[in-house]
């Protein structure tokens, strides 16, 4: 792909223009809507040289023809560039169950226990990867990294002297996705119990939540905070512009971009998981399942207050992720 001409001023106005030409997409979940929002926020924060370098690298991606060729309906160069960066943010989900898939890269299961007694009993027996340092010889082919390690690897390889342009492009796509992942609290934490969740609740995937039409799970609830849009549609772009118009959120983003360590981002998400995601009602439901691990945990009906807090947390985390992603991609040389 030819390096694009990015000689235009960064800002939020360009987000609004795309509304006129992008049609609504099919249903999906957070990892489309949320990740594309992170990418759009990041794009608004990048300077022109960074945009040029990032788009140039994505033009060298080994799957550029399949995943990074904008739809013909997008004629405006600026809109095509936005589509490409938002596509980079979902590429790692598009290649799931292929040889490029790295399932463990998306999360880390920092433990949450029902009590101090449970922590003392269970922690020595945990079999989870909580490492923050890369194993010796780690590469983009290494399967069993956690999200902290994966981010560290991609940042290292992004400017490694022996890295090919194709490898660096893959690093960009992973970073566009993983920076979003690590800001979703359920990607940082799992609840561990002595009987039912000895191996963890998979970031809330095994905790049922009462839904309007059918029950979902805790992880899905948080994944769904930004709706079910598979592609870049007008509503999604309007929401990105609204996030960037919120002074409090922008202030939070500016504070966040000063802290660029993946371990710090996980620690923030873990605190949110502990303080917001795993509410007293959810912990009580998990605890009730310990008496009979074979019996289904009762679905938790979340309160209006919980929903409001979740919405506020999700909005802030997406903005923080976008600001940080812009700073990380500024490392591209």
Specify the residue positions occupied by each region the protein language model found.
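Bacterial N-terminal signal peptides that target proteins for export
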Residues: 1-15
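Short hydrophobic transmembrane-like helices used for membrane targeting/insertion
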Residues: 18-22
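N-terminal signal peptide c-region/cleavage motif recognized by signal peptidases
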Residues: 24-26
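N-terminal, motif-rich segments that launch catalysis or mediate targeting to/interaction with membranes
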Residues: 28-178, 185-333
